[in-house]
Amino acid sequence: MRLEKCWFCSSTIYPGHGIQFVRNDAKIFRFCRSKCHKNFKMKRNPRKVKWTKAFRAAHGKDMTKDTTFEFEKKRNRPERYDRNVTENTLMAIKKIAKIRTAREAKHIENRLKPNKQKKLNDDMKELDQNIHMVQAPGAQKIKVDVSEKKSVQNEAMEE
């Protein structure tokens, strides 16, 4: 089964899905959905559209340079079937997937770390400025006795 990549968003296109556009110079553009095709016709740059993989790679949102990506290269050379090689390949795929998920999690954690510290500093600054609004959890509530002057005024209003 041949899986293609969308020209605009780089997502996988399965057989029987998507649309294909062939330019006069025989350049083939494949699109996964009409959203990508419309954006292409509007001459939008995929690196500037926030939901595309090109944007995420260009702005450091996703992991782009990693040794685990080299295993996914397309190879057009047919190889003779060997059960042992196939078994080893399938085991290697599982190990690589596990390594990649761990590295992606670490990448996300490192990417969010500076903002986490900045948010903590901003929260501490706001707390220092508005400390008078915070009540101590161990403080007892003060009960205020209402004087009878108000009740006399209420009776006068009722009449």
Curated annotation (Swiss-Prot):
InterPro entries named among the record's database cross-references: L24e/L24_sf (IPR038630), Ribosomal_eL24 (IPR056366), Ribosomal_eL24-rel_N (IPR000988), Ribosomal_eL24_CS (IPR023442), TRASH_dom (IPR011017)
Family annotation (Gene3D superfamilies): Ribosomal protein L24e
PROSITE patterns, sorted: RIBOSOMAL_L24E
Principal subcellular localization: nucleus
SMART domains recorded: TRASH
Ribonucleoprotein as UniProt keyword: no
Keyword annotations from UniProtKB, A to Z: Nucleus, Ribosome biogenesis
UniProt subcellular location: Nucleus, Nucleolus
Record protein name field: Probable ribosome biogenesis protein RLP24
